[in-house]
Amino acid sequence: MKKELSFHEKLLKLTKQQKKKTNKHVFIAIPIVFVLMFAFMWAGKAETPKVKTYSDDVLSASFVGDIMMGRYVEKVTEQKGADSIFQYVEPIFRASDYVAGNFENPVTYQKNYKQADKEIHLQTNKESVKVLKDMNFTVLNSANNHAMDYGVQGMKDTLGEFAKQNLDIVGAGYSLSDAKKKISYQKVNGVTIATLGFTDVSGKGFAAKKNTPGVLPADPEIFIPMISEAKKHADIVVVQSHWGQEYDNDPNDRQRQLARAMSDAGADIIVGHHPHVLEPIEVYNGTVIFYSLGNFVFDQGWTRTRDSALVQYHLKKNGTGRFEVTPIDIHEATPAPVKKDSLKQKTIIRELTKDSNFAWKVEDGKLTFDIDHSDKLKSK
């Protein structure tokens, strides 16, 4: 009876066989083998997390970065189902009262819309909004540099589909006045969370105007009064901010200036995105600033663009605001928590905490830190 070869023995045998063939065949076969090896390795380390629930929570929230459901991601969802890409994080979302992310593409009902004058155009179908609703997302940000990739009609389709799914969208509207009205308010156990969205990067003609759909720019004349207004009606103000330089792991001066202005206006939590890579966390005057959570659902293949983070926020009965940041790896557009004590986990946490100005620790594979949020319970 022939002995069954192990995977590594098969790999060695294949490598030896390739030496007898041309260099062309070697260069084709070996990368395929390593792709397969990586797939096996990733499948082995991806684990569906066991979600802890806390009896002393008043509310729990989850924040993620860029969600792009088109291009190659759409091919994955067509083959495996749209819900499959959330299989490793769905339990976290299910356990959250509030879930937010950046919707990095317009919904288009047709394929023949006029494209914006730019190089890269992203779009997705209406099923993407439904699956986000099914995954327990409560609000998405549309203030970004791809929201108007398919013009006014693409924006109208997007706003219309979110309304059909009864899913809040911020950062864009049918006009400037409509976009300014789109402050999402959600009440959980007597605590009101407000969400707003702004973008500091966009294409020509993307900004909402008096009679034209579009996005809200990160203009202090717009965001300061809006954040101040939200602060009057909410206990916690969350600002989604699309900003920074793509593929830069360090926030620039412009991001820091905007973050401070948003904080001074009343923002409690600022969630940044657009760089497609992770940037550090900062605490400024009690405001927690995630300069960039990177991608969350995306088809970019570079290592740094696959490093991500999922933030869980727990407001405790004693007024503690507890932040738990789970390191995430993206493979085949699918985000999954990385293994505890792995090199990937340490790399992601190091990126998030470099030059940190707050006390943090690692617990159960997560980066954790506490902020005094006792003032958020005053309305209860």
UniProtKB/Swiss-Prot annotation:
Highest taxon in the source lineage: Bacteria
Null allele phenotype: Cells produce PGA but at a greatly reduced level.
SUPFAM superfamilies cross-referenced by the UniProt entry: Metallo-dependent phosphatases (SSF56300)
Cysteine pairs bridged by disulfides in the record: none
Pfam families: PGA_cap
Sequence similarity: Belongs to the CapA family.
Function: Seems to be required for maximum PGA (gamma-polyglutamic acid) production.
Protein name: PGA biosynthesis protein CapA
Species of provenance: Bacillus subtilis (strain 168)
Lineage: Bacteria, Bacillati, Bacillota, Bacilli, Bacillales
